[in-house]
A protein has these predicted regions:
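Short, compact, well-ordered microdomains
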Residues: 61-65
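A general structural signal for short secondary-structure junctions and capping/turn motifs
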Residues: 1-3, 37-40, 57, 149-151
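Active-site and NAD+-binding cores of ADP-ribose-processing enzymes
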Residues: 2-4, 8, 13, 20, ...
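Extended catalytic/binding region for NAD+/ADP-ribose chemistry, centered on the ART fold
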Residues: 35-60
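Short aromatic-glycine-(Arg/Gly/Cys) micro-motifs in beta-strand/loop hairpins
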Residues: 18-40
Length: 176
């Protein structure tokens, strides 16, 4: 795969001290700790809004811009990958049923089931020699844009970076 085939700008909302340290180079990208919560909707990783600096700013007190190479991306806008996700869910469901355990559920802003299925799919793929470096997915959020609309006012695309080598550089976005 061409290393520079899918380059995008991503925006990460975070604490101001963290943003400053990263942008000034006082904190290396390799020291950036990925989120590993059991409810992270795209699984474990460092989360970015694709082309969404204002949304990142709404979420965190400061914003770090990043040039991202999606690399080998589990792109959930592609039916090839959503089909894999559906298959992985069925496999997990079978295991949980056989063990008499309830599957985790998504509740409100907690995406425990999504997190489990994506992390397991990435693990299964890795065992087969396919290493997903990033996960990308649209997130429909907010009220309808107008009455009867399927478009939501706060919809966005998020990226979870699992391989820090995909973060080519960081910058201070001009939010002016």
């Amino acid at each position: 795969m061409d290393r520079f085939s899918r380059i995008i700008l991503g925006y990460h909302g975070c604490e101001p001290d963290f943003a400053e340290a990263l942008i000034r180079g006082e904190l290396a990208i390799d020291d950036w700790k990925p989120s590993a919560n059991p409810y992270d909707w795209l699984g474990h990783g460092i989360y970015f809004w694709e082309h969404g600096p204002q949304r990142a700013g709404d979420w965190g007190g400061a914003v770090v811009g990043a040039v991202l190479n999606l690399g080998m991306c589990l792109d959930l806008t592609d039916i090839q990958f959503t089909s894999l996700l559906a298959d992985e869910y069925e496999s997990i469901r079978g295991v949980y049923e056989a063990e008499g355990r309830p599957l985790p559920k998504n509740k409100g802003k907690r995406h425990d089931l999504d997190c489990l299925v994506i992390n397991e799919l990435i693990g299964t793929a890795s065992e087969a020699g396919i290493v997903f470096q990033t996960v990308r997915c649209p997130f429909l959020e907010g009220d309808p844009a107008f009455p009867g609309s399927g478009i939501r006012r706060e919809s966005h695309i998020q990226i979870a970076v699992r391989d820090k080598a995909c973060i080519l550089g960081v910058f201070r976005p001009n939010l002016g």
